[in-house]
């Protein structure tokens, strides 16, 4: 599946998205840009199933992690125009 996962600098380093991901797409990496000194990273996007649990778990109201579904998935879900 060709989904993309974007992590934004609004990440507060809480690890909620990492713990919510059923396929271990996300991991925490060191980053000096926030209080927690870590940020979510998505090194294994090829394993993303598009469930968006990471988005739902994010306490910053979807501002830090976003899953963009691939074209094949949006077509099969009837979301494509």
Swiss-Prot record:
GO terms for molecular function: 4 iron, 4 sulfur cluster binding; electron transfer activity; metal ion binding; oxidoreductase activity. It catalyses: reduced [plastocyanin] + hnu + oxidized [2Fe-2S]-[ferredoxin] = oxidized [plastocyanin] + reduced [2Fe-2S]-[ferredoxin]. The keyword Electron transport applies. It is found in: Plastid, Chloroplast thylakoid membrane. Residues 2-31, 39-68 form the 4Fe-4S ferredoxin-type domain. Its EC number is 1.97.1.12. It is an enzyme of class 1 (oxidoreductase). SUPFAM superfamilies: 4Fe-4S ferredoxins (SSF54862). The keyword Nuclease does not apply. This is Photosystem I iron-sulfur center.
């Amino acid at each position: 599946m060709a989904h993309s996962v974007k992590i934004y600098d609004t990440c507060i380093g809480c690890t909620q998205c990492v713990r919510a991901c059923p396929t271990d797409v996300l991991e925490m990496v060191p980053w000096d840009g926030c209080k927690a000194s870590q940020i979510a990273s998505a090194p294994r996007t090829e394993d993303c199933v598009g469930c968006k649990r990471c988005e739902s778990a994010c306490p910053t109201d979807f501002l830090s992690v976003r899953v963009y579904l691939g074209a094949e998935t949006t077509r099969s879900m009837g979301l494509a125009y």
